[in-house]
Amino acid sequence: MDPYKNRPSSAFNSPFWTTNSGAPIWNNNSSLTVGSRGPILLEDYHLVEKLANFDRERIPERVVHARGASAKGFFEVTHDISHLTCADFLRAPGVQTPLIVRFSTVIHERGSPETLRDPRGFAVKFYTREGNFDLVGNNFPVFFVRDGLKFPDMVHALKPNPKSHIQENWRILDFFSHHPESLHMFSFLFDDVGIPQDYRHMDGFGVNTYTLINKAGKAVYVKFHWKTTCGEKCLLDDEAIRVGGSNHSHATQDLYDSIAAGNYPEWKLYIQTLDPENEDRLDFDPLDVTKTWPEDVLPLQPVGRMVLNKNIDNFFAENEQLAFCPAIIVPGVYYSDDKLLQTRIFSYADTQRHRLGPNYLQLPANSPKCAHHNNHHDGFMNFMHRDEEVNYFPSRYDPVRHAERVPVPPRTLGGKREKCMIEKENNFKQPGERYRSWPSDRQERFVRRWVDALSDPRVTHEIRSIWISYWSQADRSLGQKIASHLNLKPSI
């Protein structure tokens, strides 16, 4: 299977300059004018084409994850999990699958520093024999909110103020004061790991709960974990200021230079699995994206390794036009009823169609490398050559048939239509356990970051009190420390 199938030939294999249509250009230095100093003529098509193309070079940046870096490599199965899934690319140890990865910051713009305190995106596109599989995650195992209905408001709160275009703590703390479920995510973001040293030295997570299905149709819930073999490293606040002040693209450069030097970064893939019949044994909802699954109860199981051994050839084609979507899965992997995942299934593809056009999956970085066929025709920027006469189904003139049926999770659903919260929220236990697992100096840095955020002059007494109450419910001493620094009295 050729991972570079559908890649257009180079546009620069001519010995001389040409227009986009291939006509030779004998002068690329001067515009066509009336005399040496006269006005430029509109008939200078080369000038018009050159400027028009330049004016349209930029496309809409991603609404989140705008700043990113990509690399290519392979995934190799090291442990047999065929009893859990019928996915072809996981069929046996030794099987290799080409892939491309995009690491990113989340909130800030395309040219922002890579040293800001921000989650990091960790998205992997597997080019399998059964189509692409996009595992679209982050460097933290949890998320801010559990229901995708809140996602647009969440991003608005984290993004800069629409009036001043300045990111401000009072907006963030105001919004999340209504969402105590966010505490677990903030226990990562305001922790030392909130600023990874670079992309090679951070772990990754699928974040959402998916489902694995084996050949017999047996389904289990699954969480995906990427563990870096380089070791997890982070930047403390003063280090981030120093590194960011000297190179705002330090993580991109580190990734590129390491691969170019032959120091290929590697991650081990692990999974946690849970039989849906046993989910009531947990004190939280396993489909709640703000929770981690305890590894002492649901241990990590090794699956394989990912090696990045090739840099991208073109940043625009393989980073800006690279598009991921959690809806893109393969037989043997399926969704769950995770509320955030369910909304991501729609939203990601929708934003790619806005950003890149309806035929974004025809772009070389996004197209499958296996044979594929459907009747999705035409549209803006369609460049697939098709010469068939039958563009409907079914037809006795077209031999293409249905694929072999693949197992999907069997389930029976019942209930009334309603908008409601999940039953087992349990918002405070896991962030408290995480805080208590740290040494005292790490705890103190966490407290200091929260004190700095809550010291924003526009943060009201009410909002400060709410956050102290939340952190007190997670850990009484933590709430007391934050309150003491702010000269407030905890309510719990």
From Swiss-Prot:
A GO term for molecular function: catalase activity
Q: Which UniProt keywords apply?
A: Glyoxysome, Heme, Hydrogen peroxide, Iron, Metal-binding, Oxidoreductase, Peroxidase, Peroxisome
Principal localization reads other
Q: What is this protein called?
A: Catalase-3
Supply the InterPro entries for this chain: Catalase, Catalase_AS, Catalase_clade1/3, Catalase_core, Catalase_haem_BS, Catalase_immune_responsive, Catalase_sf
The cofactors required by this protein are: heme
Q: What is its EC number?
A: 1.11.1.6
**Organism ancestry:** Eukaryota, Viridiplantae, Streptophyta, Embryophyta, Tracheophyta
